[in-house]
């Protein structure tokens, strides 16, 4: 009996101990976020896309995938906004299943506020709802090249139009639901048209307040369902003071919005020609941030190593906001895959469009080395 009681006591003591947790991957401490932002595949590319995720991203320790869907989904809430041959619910569920199985956080993106057109093409929202246009007198069919007298790069919707968010939030909610997403990327980069004189609602208003108001409205809507907002960071940087210019930063005074937006908005801080060190600026402003690279392999590797160094050399509060690195691809998935295969020697190399694929190869190698 005495021996039985001793064994029982030992067993109870063992059961009271906290469960052992698996050892964390070393790269999780060095670089918590390791992402890719890319256009969603066309339906005919689904098998190749899933093979790419499983064969390339998983083994390289990627844990975030941002998919630019825009109007390429078969929206039930607003069928008029569908692009031709859009992804179906079943297509998206296949992507969700692979990412969930492999521990990859999947985040859908629709460009909000800006990027409502490209060159001569007006995208679905303003095509179907022209009353939402911030400056309707500027016609995309008259686009020639940049720069141009009308300052047309991409159209914007009016953030103060009383009906725009009813439509926008319908499709955002539908997309987040089908993706099972706990975050949404709203784009919001390169917004040149904002607070325009011809807009009866925005004319004369502070552009920083307009931008911050739209960010906050979207963020608050997402937060109601426990979702986080992600945006590109360029409009929150002063292009003149930093010397970053009007693309990677702002010339139209939206940069002051950095002090007006909620502190849980995730900033994707993109720089493609140099490894500019603005990630620390966002972190010291209280915002979570990841550095984003594109087509220069040397710059991309430096951005990753800088982020690792920043995290090591910062106070814990700041280091926690320096989240990691997100690689970007700015073409359709099909053309990119051909370039990527060429960069691996699997296809004929396209010299004119090779660097973005080689940059991803460099990122994969850097992630892999950090994980060892």
Identify what each model region corresponds to.
Residues 7-16:
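Bacterial N-terminal signal peptides
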Residues 9, 41, 70, 272, ...:
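Flexible loop residues that form catalytic
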Residues 20-55, 59-60, 64, 135-139, ...:
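N-terminal hydrophobic targeting/anchoring segments and the immediately downstream early-domain regions
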């Amino acid at each position: 009996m005495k021996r039985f009681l001793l064994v029982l006591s030992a067993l109870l003591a063992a059961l009271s101990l906290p469960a052992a947790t698996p050892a964390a991957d070393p790269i999780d401490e060095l670089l918590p976020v390791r992402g890719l932002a890319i256009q969603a595949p066309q339906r005919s590319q689904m098998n190749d896309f899933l093979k790419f995720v499983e064969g390339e991203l998983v083994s390289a320790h990627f844990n975030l995938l941002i998919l630019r869907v825009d109007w390429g989904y078969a929206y039930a809430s607003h069928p008029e906004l569908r692009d031709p041959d859009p992804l179906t619910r079943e297509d998206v569920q296949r992507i969700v299943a692979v990412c969930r199985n492999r521990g990859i956080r999947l985040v859908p993106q629709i460009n909000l506020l800006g990027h409502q057109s490209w060159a001569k093409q007006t995208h679905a929202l303003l095509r179907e709802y022209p009353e939402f246009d911030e400056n309707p007198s500027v016609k995309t069919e008259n686009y020639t090249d940049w720069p141009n007298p009308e300052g047309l790069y991409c159209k914007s919707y009016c953030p103060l139009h009383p009906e725009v968010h009813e439509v926008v939030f319908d499709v955002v909610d539908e997309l987040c639901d089908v993706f099972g997403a706990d975050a949404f990327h709203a784009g919001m980069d390169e917004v040149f048209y904002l607070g325009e004189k011809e807009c009866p609602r925005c004319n004369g208003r502070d552009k920083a307040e307009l931008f911050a108001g739209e960010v906050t409205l979207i963020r608050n809507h997402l937060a109601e369902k426990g979702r986080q907002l992600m945006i590109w960071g360029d409009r929150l940087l002063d292009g003149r003071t930093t010397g970053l210019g009007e693309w990677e930063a702002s010339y139209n005074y939206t940069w002051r919005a950095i002090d007006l937006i909620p502190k849980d908005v995730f900033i994707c801080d993109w720089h493609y020609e140099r490894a500019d060190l603005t990630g620390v600026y966002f972190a010291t402003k209280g915002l979570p941030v990841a550095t984003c690279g594109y087509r220069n392999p040397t710059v991309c590797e430096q951005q990753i190593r800088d982020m690792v160094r920043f995290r090591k050399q910062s106070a814990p509060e700041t280091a926690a906001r320096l989240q990691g690195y997100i690689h970007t691809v700015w073409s359709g998935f099909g053309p990119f895959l051909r370039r990527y295969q060429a960069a691996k020697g699997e296809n004929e190399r396209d010299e004119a469009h090779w660097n973005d694929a080689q940059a991803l190869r460099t990122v994969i190698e850097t992630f892999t080395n950090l994980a060892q």
